Curated annotation (Swiss-Prot):
Entry similarity comment: Belongs to the thymidine kinase family.
Protein name listed in UniProt: Thymidine kinase
GO cellular component terms, semicolon-separated: cytosol
Molecular function as annotated in GO: ATP binding; thymidine kinase activity; zinc ion binding
Catalytic activity: thymidine + ATP = dTMP + ADP + H(+)
Assembly notes: Homotetramer.
Disulfide bond annotation, renumbered to this chain: none
Record's keyword terms, sorted: ATP-binding, Cytoplasm, DNA synthesis, Kinase, Metal-binding, Nucleotide-binding, Transferase, Zinc
Positions with a binding annotation for Zn(2+): 147, 150, 185, 188
Length: 193
């Protein structure tokens, strides 16, 4: 946990679908609330799976959040707060370089910036903003799900279309849940062709 005297920092919570990223973000933000630190939580406009104006985990935990599309909006809302939380980083409409730059600006202002999101897309390729933040962050927590095929630790998000792995030419970002994605380990993951 960051003390105000320590200055700004970036914390990244990453992993595949169903690894508990948002659950961990919510847990940290509940601690922030108990500590009476000022904060703002942001969720991308593109994420329409749950009630607007909330970050919500697959297990049903949720906290109020501000729905935005760009880092410019986050920077405007996050003035003079101690903690900034950004869920589902990979779903923001903004240029990945702007998302990274904005996180750096917030941390340089002295904020604790907590970012959660997928590290890899369904093709097992890194999301650009997350890839850079993993290198720049003071703290990185990679979470794992359980492979639906064999029960091993899962690190991949398998996108399914009609029950079969999505082809390589499918859109990179499609918001969905259990009906569209499975958590899989390296051995059970079927590469997009």
């Amino acid at each position: 946990m960051t003390r105000p005297s320590e200055g700004g920092r970036i914390e990244v919570i990453c992993g595949c679908m169903y690894s508990g990223k948002t659950e961990e973000l919510i847990r940290r933000m509940r601690q922030v609330r108990i500590a009476r630190q000022s904060y703002r939580i942001f969720t991308p406009r593109m994420d329409t799976r749950y009630a607007e104006g909330h970050v919500a985990s697959h297990s049903g935990s949720r906290l109020e959040a501000i729905t935005v599309a760009t880092m410019c909006e986050i920077l405007a809302y996050a003035r003079d707060v101690q903690v900034v939380a950004i869920d589902e980083l990979h779903l923001f409409d903004d240029d990945p370089a702007e998302m990274v730059r904005g996180c750096q600006v917030l941390a340089d202002r002295g904020a604790r910036v907590i970012v959660a999101g997928l590290d890899l897309n369904y093709r097992a390729e890194p999301f650009p903003a997350m890839m850079h933040l993993l290198a720049l962050a003071e703290q990185v927590d990679k979470l794992y799900a359980i492979c639906v095929k064999c029960g091993a630790y899962a690190t991949r998000s398998q996108r399914l279309i009609d029950g079969k792995p999505a082809p390589a030419n499918a859109p990179t970002i499609v918001v969905g849940g259990l009906d569209m994605y499975e958590a899989r380990c390296r051995a059970c993951y079927e590469p997009a062709l």
